Curated annotation (Swiss-Prot):
Record-given protein name: Trypanothione reductase
Residues that bind FAD: 35-52
Keywords noted in UniProt: Cytoplasm, Disulfide bond, FAD, Flavoprotein, NADP, Oxidoreductase, Redox-active center
Database matches in InterPro entries: FAD/NAD-bd_sf, FAD/NAD-binding_dom, FAD/NAD-linked_Rdtase_dimer_sf, GSHR/TRXR-like, Pyr_nuc-diS_OxRdtase, Pyr_nucl-diS_OxRdtase_dimer, Pyr_OxRdtase_I_AS, Trypnth_redctse
EC number: 1.8.1.12
Catalytic activity: trypanothione + NADP(+) = trypanothione disulfide + NADPH + H(+)
Note: The active site is a redox-active disulfide bond.
Active site: 461 (proton acceptor)
UniProt family annotation: Belongs to the class-I pyridine nucleotide-disulfide oxidoreductase family.
Role, per record: Trypanothione is the parasite analog of glutathione; this enzyme is the equivalent of glutathione reductase.
Quaternary organization: Homodimer.
Length: 492
């Protein structure tokens, strides 16, 4: 016998849980949420809380925080701290155990949420579409596996997230993804992270801090520079600082084959013919929408050419009662975006009028060492979007690094404006506290702040953030897409 619900959600990640909670508490609807695992770890990794909580933002931030102590300990000597450096060692097992405990606490809090919230029910298993109003809960991902439950659904939200992409090359079975990296029993002595995106860059910093004596971290990327899609100035400066921190960066390189050495290490052959022996190869070449087990074809849900579920601005699919949110839509793969989409889509379904998520001016961060904070358009994007663009740029050594021994750690601040009216359309930061600073900047940009609002604001001294209140003169411009050091005519 099937159970009837106002809303069935496939996927218990950040977006799905937000949607379920709001529907049950704000609209008093009967809601079912389906997912394959309740607590973090193998075999399926993404449990209650989704990628972010289990194998993404949360554990990654904890591990990056741990990694930052390496530099802080070294730099403390400049501030008068004296200790025997030979007695200091990093304990990877302690880090992983603490990380696991913190994630488990969050998993348990979500379990309690289901127990304590009237109208909200969790089903353990693989959710798939049988009809446009019927979701099956199976024992496995295989559509032939045993059906545990059939759920009647007036409305359905698909929120199954994304999954690490792996290269299709010989020997890929000898590699791990970021999922497994969170559960390594020992820090790798020699490690190759494949990819130039934020996951690869962040793990390179983690591994570099915790590597055993004599270890080496290498990052390879098929293009140049790393972090495609981010501000070009920041990409270049971050590369310099990663190299200064001891990370090898191989650009315009991509593995073509992975072989297992007799001692268990990996022999990597690159497309250029170069080779490298490492203990661990971690693939971090991107993430793909997780749709394979959903049986979308049974009801004709359309996909994009990249395999994401196709939705409109209100997260509606082409099937009237079926919606999709978060990574599975291939829009902006960020947890706060999925949460906002989850809240918006529930308002659309059960509220008085449709509500959409604003995907513009979304602040985000890369928790590299040093970190990046970014919001809005890059230089290149702004030059294509506006007739006249002004770029304000500052690169300086933060006060602490004048005595920390790390003068190479520059702070970069860039403000990009529509020079027609002075509206700030992009802000990009590199350096300590950039992710914290950019959140406040995002609020300013949401309110359509102008460059004059920034420089007429009195800064907090001495901070790196105050630089945003001091930038009055553009470093260069773009006129109809052409870069110029000065304006050709004062009337512009």
């Amino acid at each position: 016998m099937s159970k009837a619900f106002d809303l069935v959600i496939i996927g218990a990640g950040s977006g799905g849980l937000e949607a379920g909670w709001n529907a049950a508490t704000l609209y008093k609807k009967r809601v079912a949420v389906v997912d394959v695992q309740t607590v973090h770890g193998p075999p399926f990794f993404a449990a209650l809380g989704g990628t972010c909580v289990n194998v993404g933002c949360v554990p990654k931030k904890l591990m990056v925080t741990g990694a930052q102590y390496m530099d802080q300990l070294r730099e403390s000597a400049g501030f008068g701290w004296e200790f025997d450096a030979s007695t200091i060692k990093a304990n990877w097992k302690t880090l992983i155990a603490a990380k696991n405990a913190a994630v488990l606490d969050i998993n348990k809090s979500y379990e309690d949420m289901f127990k304590d919230t009237e109208g909200l029910e969790f089903f353990l298993g693989w959710g798939a579409l049988e009809q446009k109003n019927v979701v099956t809960v199976r024992e496995g991902a295989d559509p032939k596996s045993k059906v545990k439950e059939r759920l009647q659904a007036e409305h359905i939200i698909i929120a199954t997230g994304s999954w690490p992409q792996m290269l299709k090359i010989p020997g890929i079975e000898h590699c791990i993804s970021s999922n497994e990296a969170f559960y390594l029993e020992e820090p790798p002595r020699r490690v190759l992270t494949v990819g130039g995106g934020f996951i690869s860059v962040e793990f390179a910093g983690i591994f570099n801090a915790y590597k055993p004596v004599g270890g080496k971290v290498t990052l390879c990327y098929r293009n140049n520079p790393i972090l495609r899609g981010f501000d070009y100035t920041l990409r270049q400066e971050l590369t310099k600082q990663l190299v200064a921190n001891g990370i090898d960066i191989m650009t315009n390189e991509n593995p073509s084959k992975i072989e297992l050495n007799p001692d268990g290490s990996k022999h990597v052959t690159f497309e250029s013919g170069k080779t490298l022996d490492v203990d661990v190869v971690m693939m971090a070449i991107g993430r793909l929408p997780r749709t394979g087990y959903l049986q979308l074809q049974t009801v004709g849900v359309n996909l994009t050419d990249k395999g994401a579920i196709q939705v409109d601005e209100f997260s509606r699919t082409n099937v009237p009662n079926i919606y999709a949110i978060g990574d599975v839509t291939g829009r902006i793969m960020l947890t706060p975006v999925a949460i906002n989409e989850g809240a918006s889509v529930v308002d659309t379904i059960f509220g008085s009028k449709p509500r959409k998520t604003d995907h513009t001016r979304v602040a985000s961060a890369v928790f590299s060492i040093p970190p990046i904070g970014t919001c809005g358009l890059t230089e290149e994007e702004a030059a294509k979007s506006f007739e006249k663009v002004a770029v304000y740029l500052s690169c300086f050594t933060p006060l602490m690094h004048n005595i920390s021994g790390s003068k190479y750690k520059k702070f970069v601040a860039k403000i990009i404006t529509d020079h027609g009216d002075g509206t700030v359309v992009g802000v990009h930061l590199l350096g300590d506290s950039s992710p914290e600073i950019i959140q406040a900047v995002g609020i300013c940009m949401k309110l359509n702040a102008k460059i004059s609002d920034f420089y007429n604001t009195i800064g907090v001294h001495p901070t790196s953030a105050e630089e945003l209140c001091s930038m009055r003169t553009p470093s260069h411009y773009y006129i109809k897409g052409e870069k110029m050091e000065t304006l050709p005519d004062s009337s512009l």
